């Protein structure tokens, strides 16, 4: 039995994000391991538009509903994925946590490498905050989303950290090809 620390997008106002996190958590648990969600709070995504933009477009009513959806997602996550580590907001906070080098670390299964979603936390989703002696790094059904700009991906993702993964499975064929062109072995999963 191993501790499996999962870094994913798990409490966004999006049923797909919430349910994929729950499904992965339960699958790890059903395989006889102890899952933990790394609780990385992506604050910026709660208010993706400037106040001026929201007011001009009348989005203030929309934002009330949006905030309610966040609360529901967080409540679901706490109830159905109770093992959660920390309340991190930055890569620096993740770096200062005493991660166990013998645990397993799993990224996925969502658009964790979509630069438009992960924004200032994009390197965290490559496990850049783990020390090099952590050997059990995996990615399952990680997605680049629709970001097909290879130069942007190469410059903004932590390719060195990705090269330390034992196994990587991604959703897109272009993602497999991108990783392989950069010396990182990957397979496609659906």
Predicted regions and their residues:
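Aromatic- and Gly/Pro-rich donor/ligand-binding loops
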Residues: 4-15, 19-160
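An acidic- and aromatic-residue-enriched active-site/binding cleft used to recognize and process polar
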Residues: 9, 40, 173-174, 184
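Alpha-helix N-cap/helix-start capping motif
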Residues: 22, 172-173
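Conserved dinucleotide-binding and phosphotransfer motif residues
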Residues: 31, 164, 182
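A short beta-strand/loop micro-motif in the catalytic core of glycosyltransferases
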Residues: 165-172
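Helix-loop-beta element that forms the nucleotide-linked donor phosphate-binding surface
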Residues: 176-190
């Amino acid at each position: 039995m191993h501790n499996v620390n999962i870094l994913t997008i798990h409490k966004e106002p999006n049923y797909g994000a919430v349910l994929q996190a729950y499904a992965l958590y339960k699958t790890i648990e059903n395989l006889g391991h102890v899952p933990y969600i790394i609780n990385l709070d992506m604050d910026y995504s709660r208010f993706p538009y400037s106040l001026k933009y929201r007011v001009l477009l009348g989005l203030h009513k929309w934002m009330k509903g949006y905030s309610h959806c966040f609360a529901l997602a967080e409540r679901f996550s706490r109830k159905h994925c109770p093992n959660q580590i920390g309340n991190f907001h930055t890569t620096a906070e993740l770096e200062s946590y005493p991660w166990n080098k013998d645990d397993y670390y799993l990224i996925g299964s969502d658009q964790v490498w979509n630069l438009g979603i992960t924004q200032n936390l994009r390197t965290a989703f490559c496990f850049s905050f783990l020390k090099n002696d952590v050997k059990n790094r995996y990615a399952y059904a990680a997605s680049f989303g629709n970001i097909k700009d290879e130069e942007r991906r190469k410059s903004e993702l932590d390719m060195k950290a990705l090269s330390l993964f034992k196994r990587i499975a991604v959703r897109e064929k272009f993602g497999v090809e991108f990783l392989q062109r950069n010396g990182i072995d990957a397979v496609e999963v659906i």
